[in-house]
Amino acid sequence: MFENEDNKTPATCSFCGKTEDQVKSMISGPGVYICNECVELAQSIIDTETKAEAQKDFTNVPTPHEIVDTLNQYVVGQEEAKKTLAVAVYNHYKRVNASLSDDDGTELQKSNICLVGPTGSGKTFLAQNLARILNVPFAIADATTLTEAGYVGEDVENILLKLLQNADYDVERAQRGIIYIDEIDKIAKKSENVSITRDVSGEGVQQALLKILEGTIANVPPQGGRKHPQQEFIQIDTTNILFIVGGAFDGIETMVKNRLGDKTIGFGVDSKQEYDPDKSLMQQIIPEDLLKFGLIPEFIGRLPILTALEKLTEEDLVRILTEPKNALIKQYQKLVSFDDVSLKFEDDAVKEIAHLAIERNTGARGLRSIVEATMRDIMFDIPSEDNIKEVVITKDTVDGKSKPEIVK
């Protein structure tokens, strides 16, 4: 029994005035007491305010036009994918808002998204920017690290842990975040035929992902790793988490051509020099093609929105280097400006960077490594040289044939 040390009377809750005899438990602090009933009431008030705040966050979701306009500031090209994603995200968060406001009981089903596109076409970048526009927690997972329960590798619940960590362990915020699962094509079944051997990183992972994609209460180990009976879990409802999956799906164009009856593929076709056929084929991908590729029907059913990203051209890469708000060249210009040096890339140099990325088949993802290699030596020298005013990068600099031109 808590007692007041001055008069030896039973402790009294500083908030409601009840004594410890009238409540289940009493928590003491320096000169104050609070009973379990007041703690529960305070928690109820906080929960109500949190829900109201969460509802408020999604009453002003940007319109699809506003989402695309913002994406255009950072992402070059991929107009069809932007439009599809903008509508899907807008409808998703309208659905979230409806579920928070306890509308008329009409249940709106979740529509997760599948992005198909070559390496370096901007799948991850699009998902990242969507999360930034909406100001929601975002996490990226690699499907190739996942295995079904009981095998060495990551459980699918670890994907949710990454989102929870990025939400600073705020479960309410995490439950309305976005998760992007990359390399989803790598967990396709190895063949359409049933095998007696286990496919622990393929179909088994697809099966394990079904529940969290659809919406379930998942038990997430707060420290990650495998589950064990003595471990405490954090429960996360995945119903309002938007899942975006993406993959290159190498070879799917062949499946599309075969389905459409186009048999023009052969040794005489130089696909590296022709982009238009690939673009039209990518836009004609349907769920049937994903099924033939190795995704199981149940998994495809959880991804009702399917959109394709185009292979980036050399012209696209030039624009990516120069146009967006955070364009790569602008980033390096800002870096050297801290040393009071201006940086100029000649037009031919920019085109050569884009050309090398196309040659290496790395898309936009490979641009930074090329620019970094071009800039490394001069960025090493600039801090030690007080008289450098301007650095000019030429085509020969990019090719490694000459050093940058320096103006002093």
Swiss-Prot record:
Family that this chain belongs to: Belongs to the ClpX chaperone family.
Chain coiled-coil ranges: none
GO CC aspect terms: HslUV protease complex
Residues reported in the UniProt entry to bind ATP: P118, T119, G120, S121, G122, K123, T124, F125
Short name of any one Pfam family annotated for the protein: ClpB_D2-small
SMART domains xrefs: AAA, ClpB_D2-small, zf-C4_ClpX
Name of the protein: ATP-dependent Clp protease ATP-binding subunit ClpX
Protein task: ATP-dependent specificity component of the Clp protease. It directs the protease to specific substrates. Can perform chaperone functions in the absence of ClpP.
Example of a GO biological process term: proteolysis involved in protein catabolic process
GO MF terms, alphabetically ordered: ATP binding; ATP hydrolysis activity; ATP-dependent protein folding chaperone; protein dimerization activity; unfolded protein binding; zinc ion binding
Organism: Ligilactobacillus salivarius (strain UCC118) (Lactobacillus salivarius)
InterPro entries on file: AAA+_ATPase (IPR003593), ATP-dep_Clp_protease_ClpX (IPR050052), ATPase_AAA_core (IPR003959), Clp_ATPase_C (IPR019489), Clp_protease_ATP-bd_su_ClpX (IPR004487), ClpX_bact (IPR046425), P-loop_NTPase (IPR027417), Znf_CppX_C4 (IPR010603)
Keywords from the UniProt entry: ATP-binding, Chaperone, Metal-binding, Nucleotide-binding, Zinc
Residues annotated as domain ClpX-type ZB: 1-54
PROSITE patterns to which the protein is assigned, alphabetical: CLPX_ZB
Subunit comment: Component of the ClpX-ClpP complex. Forms a hexameric ring that, in the presence of ATP, binds to fourteen ClpP subunits assembled into a disk-like structure with a central cavity, resembling the structure of eukaryotic proteasomes.
